[in-house]
Regions:
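Active-site-adjacent structural elements in enzyme catalytic domains
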Residues: 96-127, 153-167
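C-terminal regions of proteins
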Residues: 42-53, 162, 276-277, 281-299, ...
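Acidic/histidine-rich, surface-exposed loop or edge segments in extracytoplasmic proteins
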Residues: 61-63, 84-92, 139-146, 268
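N- or domain-start disorder-to-order transition segments that initiate the globular core
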Residues: 24-86
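A substrate-binding/cap region within the structured catalytic cores of diverse enzymes
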Residues: 129-285, 289
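Bacterial N-terminal signal peptides
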Residues: 9-17
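Solvent-exposed loop/turn segments at secondary-structure junctions
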Residues: 94-97, 123-127, 178-182, 304-307, ...
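Bacterial N-terminal signal peptides that target proteins for export
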Residues: 2-9
């Protein structure tokens, strides 16, 4: 089970792991508190940029290991080569994983060329024009964050990717479905989307969107069961579901799961349809971009549930763009770091194991 990480670990962990890796530009008078930004709960990327510290200096093998789907070790260069050879790469993260966020920026920088496009779960399709306006320098960052409905952890976890994209003139896809329509489906069912105006439907994949596969439905039931059992920390729920999958299969067979969740089957199916709309929307955004720009490739950042085991977004993308080549990268924080466990096999084409003992990013 993923545990909540407390601030009291901060000094011990960072003194032993991070500080020796920091570039020599740090002076003796600059201690951990100078670098650590308490308002974000991690090493502030704005501090790193302002002081000219190379991002990779904070990332060593003391923080992550890279493996193929079977647990064979890979290098960072191996990973970048795989990214540049794929039409679409999914970077599946736990949203509080500080190492994942730094790796995402690093991989974006290392894989960058004129054909690279960034795609983010964290922005919704109806604010694509706002993202474009900010990247073009037309609006201020303050207005971008407000009008773009940025996540609360934007500054600490995603800003560096947007700023790099802005600097390089790289397209950024606001790929997720608007939350109001996700909520609509969870309450009223997916058929309710058909009543929307033609203007509203522009922000959604073609309707009706494909139903979730049975494997995806089983995985979602596992998540819902874990969520009900352990409480509302979603990053904990996502990872715990992998270790509890055998127990969930038994409960599915015995018909116990709906009773535990307090949901009837109709309510569960509507929640599943809402979750599935997220995945279909992100896949449709990526497919639409590549149909218009077939020379491009896409690096897409999403919560790992949306792409683990090649389920979710990859399934929909295969439907919308059958000939595309896809690479699934799952980033897994683990308390058994740096070991690759049997439970991680097949989670992604590439699995990056990170140190779960580090403080969360937010």
């Amino acid at each position: 089970m993923i545990k909540r990480i407390y601030m009291c670990i901060l000094l011990i962990t960072f003194v032993l792991v991070i500080v020796p890796a920091v570039n020599s530009q740090l002076t003796a008078s600059e201690d951990l508190i100078d670098i650590y930004d308490e308002s974000f709960g991690d090493f502030s990327q704005s501090y790193i940029a302002a002081n000219g510290l190379p991002l990779h200096s904070l990332l060593t093998l003391g923080h992550y290991r890279i493996f193929d789907s079977l647990g064979n070790p890979l290098t960072l260069d191996d990973l970048v080569a795989n990214i540049t050879e794929s039409d679409v790469t999914f970077l599946g993260e736990i949203h509080t994983d500080v190492v994942a966020h730094y790796l995402e920026v690093l991989l974006l920088e290392m894989a960058w060329d004129k054909n690279q496009t960034l795609s983010l779960e964290m922005f919704e399709t109806d604010v694509q024009y706002v993202v474009n306006e900010y990247l073009a320098g037309h609006i201020s960052e303050e207005h971008f964050l407000k009008s773009g409905r940025s996540w609360g952890n934007y500054d600490s976890d995603y800003r560096a990717m947007i700023e790099f994209s802005k600097e390089k003139g790289m397209p950024v896809l606001a790929s997720n479905a608007p939350r109001r329509y996700i909520n609509m489906v969870s309450r009223l069912g997916e058929e309710s989307l058909l009543s929307l105006s033609a203007e509203a439907k522009k922000y959604l994949p073609p309707l009706p969107y494909p139903a979730a596969t049975q494997d995806y439905e089983n995985k979602f039931r596992a998540i819902m069961s874990a969520y009900h059992t352990m409480g509302p920390t979603i990053s904990e729920v996502q990872e715990d579901a992998h270790s509890e999958k055998d127990d969930v299969k038994v409960k599915l067979a015995e018909g116990q799961l709906e009773e535990e969740l307090g949901l009837d089957e109709e309510a569960f199916q509507q929640m599943l349809a809402a979750q599935n709309l997220w995945d279909a929307s992100m896949a449709w955004s990526i497919a639409s971009h590549l149909k218009q720009h077939p020379e491009n490739r896409v690096l897409h950042v999403n919560g790992s549930f949306h792409s683990d085991y090649q389920l979710g977004i990859p399934e929909h993308l295969q439907n919308y763009l059958p000939n595309s080549t896809m690479l699934g990268v799952t980033i897994v924080p683990s308390y058994e770091f740096p070991d690759f466990s049997d439970a991680m096999q097949g989670m992604g084409d590439i699995v990056i194991v990170t140190d779960a003992n580090l403080p969360p990013s937010h």
